[in-house]
A protein has these predicted regions:
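Histidine-rich, glycine-flanked metal-binding segment
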Residues: 1-57
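Divalent metal-coordination and catalytic microenvironments
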Residues: 12, 30, 52, 63, ...
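Short catalytic-loop micro-motif centered on adjacent basic/acidic residues
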Residues: 93-94, 124-127, 242-247
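A glycine-rich helix N-cap at a beta->alpha junction
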Residues: 113-129
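Histidine/acidic residue-rich metal-binding segments in metalloenzymes
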Residues: 135-317
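His/Asp/Glu-enriched, well-ordered alpha-helical/loop segment
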Residues: 214-240, 289, 311, 315-317, ...
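C-terminal cap of metal-dependent C-N hydrolases
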Residues: 331-335, 341, 390-458
């Protein structure tokens, strides 16, 4: 008799935001078709013994930057999705900081094609508001953008083309972007820092001849972030768009977001492991290797972020994976202004948060909510992604809660892995046994085995009748083979 299931995951404990349960998972054609009491599943082609393991939904990392096509040596969709899979991420939502900027329907289509040809797991794409042309924004939404992203600060010197249509510093432009994005029905994710204040504080540091890591901290203080959140909230009170404050860092920003939420505004927020586990002390110790915008804050701010998560003011945790190679970062010890801001963190979110949970500091169910379910809901992909339930994609992480691993330089898969310094030597409880994307095993025993080009481009569930997942073009197999050959020749995982 032909097996009814393609895959059965048996004997494990599934972990969802609502709680834990001893349930077996049945998978057919890439989707979960059954959650059954132990021993009650029909026959399957493959059965995975998950006794003693936790079964989690794959992470939906909703803040990731791929550097291709202009800087593939830092990261492309091949290496970036390999790194993601190694960290338990099964869906990436990629925010535009690339050249050409993802601010037109044409570039969005090119970026989707690039992702389809290289990705090992599923990828969704943000678009930028561009030149604030209503028909173009509507076209990008109809093509499958998961959301729009803007930055309230200006483009870094020399990177203007990558930020074109993304960096909007004037209130009138932010207001117009809010109006236009509201009409698409999508979310607007916003980097909240005020450029005028950044200019003031940077000028003071330059005038004093300051160029060390502490100068960067002083150049982007909490007030710059708080003013950005306040401006966004005040403008949006008149517009009524759905807005999401990304990589929030400070107690003051949490307070402001909570205030706007209490007034009924559709404002949500995100933070990242960099701010939950790092502080100003780390910025001084690791210098350019943890230079991020906004910068790392005080331990009091860190505590406020955890409180904001527990109380619901902050909805999601994402990596803000923004890779630069180690050689690009190192000159920042003598001149912090000369190096880019960003950490290659897509492989760190799961291990750091699972460790926190397995040590009893936070509930693992909450971690699942913050990293999988909430981002899937927020970006409108929760029908297929982020959940362990019937009908969802079989995106699974099998985690051994009794194992412990030390984070070492050889662990990481990003092309910019040599810039990861701040977590080396850290011991984390919980070790990934395997990761599954749509019912296919993509990691095993620490190796990434998912092939380049197997990933799909995910679009909002609202487009499910037309293009919920954009399938590869007819020539995708050739592109996939070429990408795999290149990865092998470069020694990629």
């Amino acid at each position: 008799m032909r097996p009814e299931l393609d895959l059965a995951v048996t004997g494990g404990t599934i972990v969802r935001g609502e709680g834990r349960a001893a349930l077996d998972i049945g998978v057919h054609e890439g989707r979960i078709v059954a959650l059954a009491e132990p021993g009650r599943l029909p026959s399957a082609r493959e059965t995975v013994d998950a006794r003693g393991l936790l079964v989690l939904p794959g992470i939906v990392d909703s803040h990731f930057h791929c550097r291709a096509p202009d800087h593939p040596e830092r990261e492309d969709f091949d290496s970036g999705t390999a790194a993601a899979a190694a960290g338990g991420v099964t869906t990436l939502l990629e925010m535009p900081i690339s050249d050409p900027a993802c601010a037109t329907p044409e570039v969005l289509a090119q970026r989707m094609a690039l992702a389809r040809s290289q990705a090992r797991i599923d990828v969704g794409l943000f678009a930028a508001p561009g030149d604030l042309d209503a028909p173009r924004l509507q076209e990008m939404a109809a093509a499958g953008a998961v959301a729009f992203k803007l930055m309230m600060h200006g483009a870094p010197p020399g990177r203007e083309s990558s930020f074109r249509g993304l960096a909007l510093t004037e209130n009138r432009d932010v207001y117009r972007a809010l109006e236009l994005v509201r009409e698409t029905g999508l979310l607007l994710a916003v980097h909240c820092e005020d450029q005028g204040l950044i200019d003031l504080f940077e000028a003071r540091e330059h005038a004093a001849g300051a160029a060390g890591p502490a100068a960067h901290l002083r150049s982007r203080p909490v007030v710059a972030e708080a003013l950005g959140v306040a401006r966004l909230g005040a403008l949006n009170e008149a517009v009524g768009a759905r807005v999401h404050v990304v990589h929030m860092t400070s107690a003051r920003a949490v307070e402001y977001v909570r205030w706007f939420q209490a007034r009924g505004q559709a404002m949500s927020a995100e933070t990242t492991p960099a701010y939950l586990f790092g502080s100003e002390d780390d910025a001084l110790r690791f210098g350019p290797f943890v230079k991020v915008n906004p910068p790392l804050r005080t331990l009091d701010d860190q505590a406020a972020l955890w409180q904001g998560l527990r109380q619901g003011a902050i909805a999601t945790i994402a990596s803000d994976h923004a890779p630069f190679r180690g050689a690009e970062k190192a000159p920042g010890w003598s001149d912090i202004w000369a190096v880019g801001a960003g950490i290659p963190g897509v492989e760190l979110t799961g291990p750091l948060l699972w460790d926190e949970a397995l040590r009893g500091r936070v509930a693992l169910e909450q971690v699942v909510r913050w990293t999988s379910e909430a981002p899937a809901d927020l970006y409108g992909i929760g029908r297929r992604k982020g959940y362990l339930r019937e009908g969802a994609d079989a995106d699974l992480v099998l985690l051994d809660p009794e194992a412990e691993r030390e984070l070492t330089a050889t662990d990481f898969h990003s092309r910019s892995a040599d810039a990861i310094r701040h977590v080396l030597g850290r011991r984390c409880r919980g070790a990934i046994v395997s990761v599954w994307s749509r019912g296919e095993r993509v990691t095993e025993a620490g190796r990434v085995i998912g092939t380049p080009g197997r990933g799909r481009v995910v679009v909002p569930d609202a487009l499910a009748g037309t293009a919920a997942v954009l399938e590869p073009e007819p020539n995708a197999s050739a592109a996939r083979a070429e990408s795999a050959a290149r990865a092998e020749s470069e020694g990629a995982p």
